[in-house]
């Protein structure tokens, strides 16, 4: 059933170049929406939309299932701060989870947190998701997403 899956990821901050962010979402019908806003050197916002095949959606679900992110809780994760924020929302089957934390610079930040095991799951899942999305956008539109 296609209506049992949704994913949205956001990472951003407000700084001297304004509101800079990366956001993408996969909708139940297979629509991938992507936005990348950087005002550095007067860059313009990149917005792209495309539909992905059912097999891509199935692979996305597999990546999420394998990560076991649905077993995690962000209560002990660093809260968003002046450096930035990350948000991950997933609906998969009858589960609806939402995480909010600060930007993570490296595994050092993960290891120094109050919940390194849980934050590590989040960190690696986000890396996998970004890699997949950048590949899909790059292949579909022949652009460099970052």
UniProtKB/Swiss-Prot annotation:
| A biological process term (GO) from this entry | regulation of mRNA processing
Q: Which GO terms describe its molecular function?
A: RNA binding
Any one Gene Ontology cellular component term annotated for this protein: nucleoplasm
User: Impact of altering residue 136 to R?
Assistant: Complete loss of nonsense-mediated decay activity
Q: Changing residue 73 to K does what?
A: Abolishes interaction with PYM1 leading to increase EJC association with spliced mRNAs
Transcription regulation as a keyword of this entry, yes or no, is: no
Stated family: Belongs to the mago nashi family.
Q: Where are the transmembrane segments?
A: none
Give the Gene3D superfamilies listed for this entry: Mago nashi (3.30.1560.10)
Keyword match NADP: no
Residues where N-acetylmethionine is found: 1
Q: What keywords does the record list, in alphabetical order?
A: Acetylation, Cytoplasm, mRNA processing, mRNA splicing, mRNA transport, Nonsense-mediated mRNA decay, Nucleus, RNA-binding, Spliceosome, Translation regulation, Transport
Q: Which organism is it from?
A: Homo sapiens (Human)
Its assembly, as annotated, is: Heterodimer with RBM8A. Core component of the mRNA splicing-dependent exon junction complex (EJC); the core complex contains CASC3, EIF4A3, MAGOH or MAGOHB, and RBM8A. Component of the ALYREF/THOC4-EJC-RNA complex; in the complex interacts with EIF4A3, RBM8A and THOC4 (via the RRM domain); these interactions are likely specific to RNA-bound EJC. Interacts with PYM1; the interaction is direct and dissociates the EJC from spliced mRNAs. Identified in a complex composed of the EJC core, UPF3B and UPF2. The EJC core can also interact with UPF3A (in vitro). Identified in the spliceosome C complex.
Q: Name one Pfam family in it.
A: Mago_nashi
The protein in question is named Protein mago nashi homolog
Briefly state the protein's biological role: Required for pre-mRNA splicing as component of the spliceosome. Plays a redundant role with MAGOHB as core component of the exon junction complex (EJC) and in the nonsense-mediated decay (NMD) pathway. The EJC is a dynamic structure consisting of core proteins and several peripheral nuclear and cytoplasmic associated factors that join the complex only transiently either during EJC assembly or during subsequent mRNA metabolism.
What the entry lists under InterPro entries is as follows: Mago_nashi (IPR004023), Mago_nashi_sf (IPR036605)
Q: State where the protein is found.
A: Nucleus; Nucleus speckle; Cytoplasm
Q: In which tissues is it expressed?
A: Ubiquitous.
